[in-house]
């Protein structure tokens, strides 16, 4: 069987799946193997899966080759040239901030359009202002007394893993910080946010190339699969992974053998001290937790207070629009949001209070 498979592969022409004299790969496989109807179905499925895995593993390789060529050109650019590219990305992202936010919410069903837009603008404007004058290229600092010189050099090709909760803003800021330092970046999109991520990549890519960035500086896997992402993360030419997403994905990045910087859920408790301004503390906690329907990785998950503060904090929460559950409502909500294995029900992610209450059967929540 192994010899026949090799023979079939030799018949491949012009990148076609290994068929035989124009016939589909499945037909050739079945002609050689034969079998019952169940065997035929199994053969078709196995060949299809094998072809998909081969193709998925090849997609990142093409992007990596292009990125490697871009890396050589970026390495020869001056700080002024890199700054021009970064500025162009910021301007384009700001111009399309609302449209990209709308796309993200419509595709994923997560969050609020106005908050997604604010995140896009934060990445495009606030982040840009913070890094605009930072020197990343060449001699960064010199200490004559200690006889040391700090020299900035590109790290190389970066793999950018993008989540579905913050898809467009993540692409914007990762593109900016990579171009600022002269590093090509290849994005691996979350499967449930492919379209808005690809469109954001196109926006920043066109802006970057229009400002002088070489082709291949910013790219994206168009059909995300586990095989494609792993191939990208583990390739020798990938020098750094910027992983934003769930715990399993961040863990996979850390165990890939490539240096990685991971960002995942960090939704911890907020402690209100007895000396705090209760009104202001509650306002900030509610603003944080409700922003983009709680999709921010650092939005507060719970509130901790001293017993003597409980009444004041509870009253302030109600005054600012929070709804406090009674024991039965607490039971219903807990049963809905926590699955038997201890994980969270994904149906609540990025959804409004009204939607979560309805799904959990809470009829009194306004």
Residue ranges and their predicted role:
Residues 18, 28-29:
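Aromatic (phenylalanine/tyrosine) cluster motif
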Residues 47-149, 177, 319:
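N-terminal Rossmann-like NAD(P)+-binding subdomain of aldehyde/semialdehyde dehydrogenases
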Residues 54-57, 172-173, 250-366:
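ALDH superfamily catalytic-core signature
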Residues 2-16:
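Compositionally biased, low-complexity flexible segments
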Residues 139-280:
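Rossmann-like NAD(P) dinucleotide-binding subdomain of oxidoreductase/dehydrogenase enzymes
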Residues 68-71, 75-78, 89-97, 101-104, ...:
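Structural signal for hydrophobic packing residues in well-ordered secondary-structure cores
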């Amino acid at each position: 069987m192994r010899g026949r498979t090799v023979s079939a592969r030799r018949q491949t022409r012009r990148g076609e799946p290994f068929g035989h004299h124009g016939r589909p790969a499945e037909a050739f496989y079945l002609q050689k193997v034969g079998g019952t109807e169940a065997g035929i179905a199994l053969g078709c499925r196995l060949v299809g899966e094998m072809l998909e895995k081969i193709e998925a593993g090849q997609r990142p390789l093409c992007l990596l080759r292009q990125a490697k060529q871009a890396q050589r050109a970026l390495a020869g650019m001056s700080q002024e040239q890199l700054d021009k590219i970064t500025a162009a990305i910021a301007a384009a992202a700001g111009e399309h901030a609302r449209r990209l936010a709308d796309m993200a919410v419509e595709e994923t069903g997560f969050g609020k359009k106005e908050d997604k837009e604010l995140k896009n603008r934060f990445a495009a404007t606030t982040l840009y202002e913070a890094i605009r004058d930072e020197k990343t290229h060449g001699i960064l600092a010199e200490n004559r007394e200690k006889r040391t010189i700090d020299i900035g050099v590109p790290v190389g090709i970066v793999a950018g893993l993008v989540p579905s909760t913050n898809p467009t803003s993540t692409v914007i800021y990762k593109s900016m910080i990579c171009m600022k330092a002269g590093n090509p970046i290849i994005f691996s999109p979350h499967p449930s946010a492919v379209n808005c991520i690809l469109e954001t990549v196109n926006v920043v890519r066109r802006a970057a190339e229009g400002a002088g960035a070489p082709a291949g500086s910013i790219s994206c896997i168009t059909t995300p699969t586990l095989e494609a992402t792993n191939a990208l993360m583990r390739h020798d030419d990938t020098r750094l992974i910027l992983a934003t997403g769930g715990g399993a994905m961040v863990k996979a990045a850390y165990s890939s053998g490539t240096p990685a910087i991971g960002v995942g859920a960090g939704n911890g408790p907020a402690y209100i001290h007895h000396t705090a301004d209760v009104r202001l503390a509650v306002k900030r906690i509610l603003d944080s937790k409700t922003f983009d329907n709680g999709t921010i990785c650092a939005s507060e998950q719970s509130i901790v207070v001293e017993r003597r503060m409980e009444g004041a904090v509870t009253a302030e929460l109600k005054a600012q629009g929070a709804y406090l559950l009674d024991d039965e409502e607490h039971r219903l909500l807990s049963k809905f949001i926590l699955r038997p294995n201890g994980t969270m029900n994904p149906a609540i992610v990025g959804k409004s209070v009204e939607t979560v209450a309805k799904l959990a059967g809470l009829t009194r929540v306004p």
